[in-house]
């Protein structure tokens, strides 16, 4: 992987990630394909929304279908017929989400399979091996996602163990002679000094990119912004910056304003299946009866297949009838909305008009622009 940085506007960055399987324009949003599919979408449909790269879930793909079946197909690209770049998370967040059915030790994590209750062990080495089998273009280190809230002492212990796991991840990645890229993950909860210590340790180990983890886990939005404003300027400028698991459209805008290059989130797809549709004027809840006889498109500013061909009334009808097509059309729209937002942000950075773009984004939704800390 090669990262090129073209231009900046304030702290925002316009560039690209160059892989053998294709180029990813940044800032970029990655749709989430947890089980090797963006729910309800074919790879061609996902690509048509403007997506350059997908995220796959190491933990879930390890449990089902497993490494053996993946290797029989070649790798995840061949298994799901997506021949463009794929980033896989390490499984750390999913293990964190298991709650009481997992036990974290220095060696790794013991847990019971949420599928059949089988006892399973996952550690940094195994995570690297699974991601190698998946053929991930971007591999994430195995870390512990610090819960929120956490005391500073709890956050410190978690972060320091994640640093030790980062070194083990790096060593195993190198032992496997994996030709792809490995990203470190900055932890430290809402404590700036711990974030500093985490980043310093990761840079000493050396990675191809740096992710900000442990945010969007319940902390106030102000804390997320504060941590990003503190951490981003310290990340090596020649490396991509990835904000994990984020987020709402306004979170993408605010992340870009603070120097983030990459995002992922299930929100556009999950919300689509629940009838919450993102538009240039805010969220439309298509299940609301007001849309029953509305012949207008979801968003006249959107160029997606759904908006060009169907009315709000039709989408309301499909949802009321529990038709699969409704969830698919909603997903196409939400994914395209996210990609159009990223296209707009990239264009604004290129032309030095990011402030105007951000103001218009919030004004069109009747909201105030959040302030940046100098």
From Swiss-Prot:
Its cofactor is Zn(2+). Pathway: tRNA modification; tRNA-queuosine biosynthesis. It catalyses: 7-aminomethyl-7-carbaguanine + guanosine(34) in tRNA = 7-aminomethyl-7-carbaguanosine(34) in tRNA + guanine. GO terms for cellular component: cytosol. One of its GO terms (biological process) is queuosine biosynthetic process. The keyword Phosphoprotein does not apply. The active site is at residues 89, 264. Keywords: Glycosyltransferase, Metal-binding, Queuosine biosynthesis, Transferase, tRNA processing, Zinc. Its EC number is 2.4.2.29. InterPro entries: ArchSynthase1/Queuine_TRR (IPR050076), TGT (IPR004803), TGT-like_sf (IPR036511), tRNA_ribo_trans-like (IPR002616). GO terms for molecular function: metal ion binding; tRNA-guanosine(34) queuine transglycosylase activity. Residues 245-251, 269-273 are annotated as: RNA binding. It comes from the Bacteria. Belongs to the queuine tRNA-ribosyltransferase family. Catalyzes the base-exchange of a guanine (G) residue with the queuine precursor 7-aminomethyl-7-deazaguanine (PreQ1) at position 34 (anticodon wobble position) in tRNAs with GU(N) anticodons (tRNA-Asp, -Asn, -His and -Tyr). Catalysis occurs through a double-displacement mechanism. The nucleophile active site attacks the C1' of nucleotide 34 to detach the guanine base from the RNA, forming a covalent enzyme-RNA intermediate. The proton acceptor active site deprotonates the incoming PreQ1, allowing a nucleophilic attack on the C1' of the ribose to form the product. This is Queuine tRNA-ribosyltransferase.
């Amino acid at each position: 992987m090669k990262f090129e940085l073209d231009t900046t506007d304030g702290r925002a960055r316009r560039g690209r990630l160059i892989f053998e399987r294709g180029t990813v324009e940044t800032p970029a949003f990655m749709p989430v394909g947890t089980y090797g599919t963006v729910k309800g979408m074919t790879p061609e449909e996902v690509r048509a929304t403007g997506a350059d790269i997908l995220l796959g879930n190491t933990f879930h793909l390890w449990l089902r279908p497993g490494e053996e079946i993946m290797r029989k197909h070649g790798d995840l690209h061949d298994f799901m017929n997506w021949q463009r770049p794929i980033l896989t998370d390490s499984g750390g967040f999913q293990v964190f989400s298991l709650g009481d059915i997992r036990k974290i030790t220095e060696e790794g994590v013991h847990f019971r399979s949420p599928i059949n209750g089988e006892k399973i062990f996952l550690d940094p080495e195994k995570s690297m091996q699974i991601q190698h089998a998946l053929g991930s273009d971007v591999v994430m280190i195995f870390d512990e996602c610090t819960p929120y809230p956490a005391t500073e002492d709890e956050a410190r212990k978690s972060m320091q163990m994640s640093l030790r796991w980062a070194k083990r991840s790096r060593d195993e990645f190198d032992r496997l002679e994996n030709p792809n890229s490995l990203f470190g993950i900055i932890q430290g909860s809402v404590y700036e000094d711990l974030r500093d210590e985490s980043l310093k340790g990761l840079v000493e180990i050396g990675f191809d990119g740096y992710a900000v983890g442990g945010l969007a886990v319940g902390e106030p939005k102000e804390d997320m912004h504060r941590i990003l404003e503190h951490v981003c300027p310290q990340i090596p400028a020649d490396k991509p910056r990835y904000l994990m698991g984020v987020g709402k459209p306004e979170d993408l805008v605010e992340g870009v304003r603070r120097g983030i290059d990459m995002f992922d989130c299930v929100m556009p797809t999950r919300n689509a299946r629940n009838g919450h549709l993102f538009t240039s004027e805010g969220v439309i809840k298509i299940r609301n009866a007001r849309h029953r006889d509305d012949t207008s498109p979801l968003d006249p500013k959107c160029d997606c297949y759904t908006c060009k061909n169907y009315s709000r009334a039709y989408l309301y009808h499909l949802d009321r009838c529990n038709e699969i097509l409704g969830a698919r059309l909603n997903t196409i729209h939400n994914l395209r909305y996210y990609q159009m937002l990223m296209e707009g942000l990239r264009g604004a950075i290129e032309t030095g008009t990011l402030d105007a773009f951000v103001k218009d984004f919030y004004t069109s939704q009747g909201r105030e622009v959040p302030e940046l800390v100098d």
